[in-house]
């Protein structure tokens, strides 16, 4: 099961340093020297030879500020270095990362470890740690390959006999991304003022304001000659407010602001105005009726549509899912076939840094296997064209297209970066709304639904469970066909299965917008973006959302005692 969360950060512009800086870099020097030494030494140290060795070192700094009810709630700073080792033995055709049937796909892959290394940047200390961890990884790889051979001897042949790994050319790139710290004292005061504003309402049970920023530089070196250093800066300002209805349903509103500099964050006045809007929406939600299960026409506003595409199609076009024996392989044999409306084109391009001035969180230059990021055409005019690929080949797709991703400590698999949906025929949003009403009348439905805002979603692609998706709306309206005003409603989740749902898209607006988020799957949490216009879906199914049985607080918050 994979989850998509609302963004907590965005990409900032890097400061690229000269090549002379690379020669002085103790991290790069330690990684390269120990890689060369280890690869030469381990290559024929055992009967099963080492054929590939890669290191990824992530050096990060993080700061987080939070305020609640007019007081500073958290102020923390962290530094960390994480080393991941990709160790492969035998041959590309069959190696220690091969799926052991009966295990989860990633449980049999021990190529990657989440390991702390010396913080000081001392080359000798770094090499000692790298040597220690590489030795352990080599022994584990040998052990795992023995399990692979035994498993293959007693299980049925795979449907897709593609190799476990594919070659990639050597890459050389060096940049150091630095982050200038903001005026923390000023931000502490600003957060306290923002948070005090939300404390003035008795129906708000919890609220808060946060700002966080992170500086991250990644080193990628491997036995094929790749030497890459690249980095990102991430920053966000966000607020949230929650309440609970008398029937136990948790409600929330909020906003997050992604920018490429602290100067680019909205003014205090703009944030206060947005808070006032969110407060009014939360109050209205408390009195809104619950929607009964429904199947019929609906509009997904642009950001909500981005999450929808991420869940119903994005994960199912990740290449390794077409090969894994326990995967549903929904689209594995549909390349060249029509899978959705003729107006829909879908691609993923991690090289995009922004869309109409909005930074894209899914941007990266090189993936976690040292392959340069590439634009990948997935669907063209409704026809499936390809898959997102890491260096694990599948039938008909022998090479990576730069989409191998992971968070530290987990094996790399194919993942989305910046998923973009484009429509060849569009209308204005008011025209799309008119098409919704017309479709409702055609189907004899008294109303349709409009999904304004979402919190994320999740999907399942394994054969062991229902291969369905769920998207979690936050703000939904009924649009009536008889001219009554739109009505805010609550308590619904969007559900469905991918092949049917993807085929029901019938029209799109010209209001493309960005959803920035963080996606969780078997290779961990990675930053992603989706770009999409609002879309009309001729048939969308919703079910009642989960809720607690807990009543609202007996007493009002203490700030409201009279």
Annotate the PLM regions:
Residues 372-374, 474-475:
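Short loop/turn microsegments at loop-to-beta-strand junctions
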Residues 385-439:
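C-terminal, non-catalytic macromolecule-binding modules
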Residues 17-371, 380-383, 396, 446-447, ...:
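Active-site bordering "gate/hinge" segments
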Residues 349-351, 389-392, 424, 454-456:
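Histidine- and/or cysteine-centered catalytic micro-motif in compact active-site loops
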Residues 3-15:
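Bacterial N-terminal signal peptides
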Residues 254-256, 390-392, 490-492:
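Residue-level structural signal for beta-strand termini and adjacent loop
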Residues 231, 388, 488-490:
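Short linear motifs in exposed loops
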Residues 362, 422-500, 516-523:
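Hydrophobic alpha-helical bundle architecture
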């Amino acid at each position: 099961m994979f989850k998509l969360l609302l963004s907590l950060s965005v990409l900032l512009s890097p400061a690229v340093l000269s090549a002379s800086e690379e020669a002085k870099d103790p991290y790069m020097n330690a990684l390269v020297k120990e890689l060369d030494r280890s690869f030469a030494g381990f290559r024929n140290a055992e009967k099963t030879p080492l054929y590939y060795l890669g290191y990824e070192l992530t050096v990060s700094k993080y700061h987080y500020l939070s305020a609640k009810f007019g007081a500073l709630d958290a102020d923390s700073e962290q530094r960390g270095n994480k080393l991941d080792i990709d160790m492969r033995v035998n041959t590309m055709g069959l190696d220690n990362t091969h799926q052991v049937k009966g295990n989860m796909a990633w449980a049999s892959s021990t190529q990657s470890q989440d390991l702390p290394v010396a913080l000081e940047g001392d080359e000798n200390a770094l090499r000692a740690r790298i040597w220690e961890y590489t030795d352990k990884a080599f022994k584990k790889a040998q052990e795992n390959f023995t399990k692979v051979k035994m498993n293959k001897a007693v299980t049925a042949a795979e449907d897709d006999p593609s190799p476990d790994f594919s070659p990639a050319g050597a890459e050389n790139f060096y940049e150091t991304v630095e982050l200038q710290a903001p005026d923390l004292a000023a931000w502490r005061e600003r957060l306290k003022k923002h948070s005090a504003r939300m404390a003035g309402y008795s129906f708000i049970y919890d609220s808060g304001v946060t700002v966080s920023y992170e500086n991250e530089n990644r080193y990628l070196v491997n036995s094929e000659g790749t030497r890459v250093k690249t980095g990102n800066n991430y920053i966000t300002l966000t607020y949230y407010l929650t309440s609970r209805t008398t029937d136990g349903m948790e409600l929330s509103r909020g906003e997050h602001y992604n920018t490429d500099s602290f100067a680019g964050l909205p003014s205090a006045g703009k944030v206060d105005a947005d808070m006032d809007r969110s407060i009014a929406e939360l109050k209205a939600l408390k009195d809104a009726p619950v929607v009964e299960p429904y199947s019929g026409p609906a509009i997904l506003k642009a950001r909500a549509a981005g999450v929808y595409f991420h869940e119903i199609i994005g994960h199912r076009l990740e290449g390794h899912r077409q090969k894994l024996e326990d995967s549903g392989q929904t689209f594995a044999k549909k390349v060249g076939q029509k899978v959705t409306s003729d107006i829909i084109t879908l691609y993923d391009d991690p090289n995009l840094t922004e869309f109409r001035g909005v930074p894209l969180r899914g941007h990266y230059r090189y993936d976690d296997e040292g392959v340069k990021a590439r634009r990948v055409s997935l669907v063209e005019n409704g026809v499936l064209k390809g898959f997102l690929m890491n260096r694990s080949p599948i039938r008909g797709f022998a090479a990576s297209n730069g989409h191998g991703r992971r968070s530290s400590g987990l094996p790399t698999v194919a993942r989305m970066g910046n998923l973009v949906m484009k429509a060849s025929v569009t209308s204005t949003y008011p025209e799309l709304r008119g098409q919704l009403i017309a479709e409702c009348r055609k189907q004899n439905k008294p109303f349709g639904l409009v999904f304004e805002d979402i919190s994320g979603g999740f999907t399942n692609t394994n054969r062991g469970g229902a291969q369905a998706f769920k998207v979690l709306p936050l703000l939904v309206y009924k649009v009536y066909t008889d001219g009554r005003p739109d009505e805010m409603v609550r308590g619904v989740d969007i559900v469905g299965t991918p092949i049917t749902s993807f085929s029901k898209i019938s029209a799109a607006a010209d209001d493309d917008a960005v959803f920035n988020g963080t996606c969780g799957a078997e290779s961990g949490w990675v930053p992603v973006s989706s770009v999409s216009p609002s879309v009309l879906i001729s048939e969308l199914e919703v079910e009642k959302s989960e809720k607690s049985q807990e009543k609202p607080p007996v007493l009002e918050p203490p700030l409201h005692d009279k």
